[in-house]
């Protein structure tokens, strides 16, 4: 049994139940089931079979989910893409791309153009269920990592991992009863794709919005009780709510992951949207690692929640040996349902995974992150965490957003430069003095106003782009 079998079950047992709710339409489970069977016929006619790896680039979320589900049911490996990823560098050889755009996609194999009639093909309702993947440990799905500090990695997942991720993800959502999940992360991300399946595979509704105002209106209109988002989504929703205060009384829980939640944002979200916030930490390779209610986290900067019982985690020092509780070092994790970097091979799923974070684990299992190893700023006699400085700037008067980066110098060391989005004039010296008062090591060389702080789909700052903006005339 797999998640598509559950979708097909609900298509039969509760066909009128709302499966997907969009700003302009509602799709029932019955329609999802019919769509999957129809698309299976179209996929076979396109001469795609389990020997192929297929990229999926479809903007319409409903169609995207249906096509991926049909491929999965047929035992065909898929990877969701935006169309700009360099898959070959990540170790992925794609045989074809199913796209709703009639344009060339270099290195993506042959183009299979998605047509409207894919969803209206005749099929044999009595046909035997497809055999699917050859076994539960075979490669079934590829997810691209965020690539915030390096090139995106292609993470391979077996059918067993895909199914178990859905189950473990559900276990993080037990703080409140819910039936309608609004899922804001994109489906090309592990967070977005997994969250949508955690709703649909259990017979719940997945609600998708195109903007912050859409999200607020749809929560109110459809009685959404669970919101899945990253901090950037919540930032825009709070800003929109400030202009258009749409009540959201049905919201019972907000799950936030993908990036650290700025301390100044917490009271705004709790006052305007929902008081109960579940904070989570995960990675594309490992899945959920830690989670906890905001009340246990908000007073501990950098805390991400308590380690999940299905996770082995250690903090290691420079000698790669575990350090005592509450001592900072590099994080490594290992889970039963771990994906693997395709360039390393399937055996990598059995080894420790190093997500690139610096942090500590308390005696009671609270995971606290200081920052990213790759983002640490080399000041010569010490390393500075840009994330800690950004947390201090959260809520600074007049600042909308801020990004701290290390700017390389001829000496081999780095200077601290800051890009900010602001309302009104910015007093550069005041910001420098504010940070220096917080920490005498935080000696900022430059503060520059930017029109945008570039973030990826998970809300994480793309620091390479920030450096380019700061160096631009």
Predicted regions and their residues:
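AMP-binding/adenylate-forming catalytic core of the ANL superfamily
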Residues: 227, 358-443, 454, 459, ...
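Conserved ATP/PPi-binding loop(s) of AMP-dependent carboxylate-activating enzymes
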Residues: 306-310, 321-351, 366, 382-384
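Conserved beta-loop-beta connector loops within the AMP-binding
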Residues: 300, 314-333, 360-364, 424-428, ...
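Conserved AMP-binding A3 loop
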Residues: 28-30, 140-167
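Conserved AMP-binding/adenylation subdomain of ANL enzymes
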Residues: 163-180, 188-226, 240
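Gly/Ser/Thr-rich phosphate-binding loop
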Residues: 225-228, 240-300, 312
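Conserved AMP-binding/adenylate-forming core of the ANL superfamily
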Residues: 8, 16-47, 52-61, 69, ...
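Conserved pre-ATP/AMP-binding loop-to-beta segment of ANL
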Residues: 15, 123-144, 150-151, 174-180
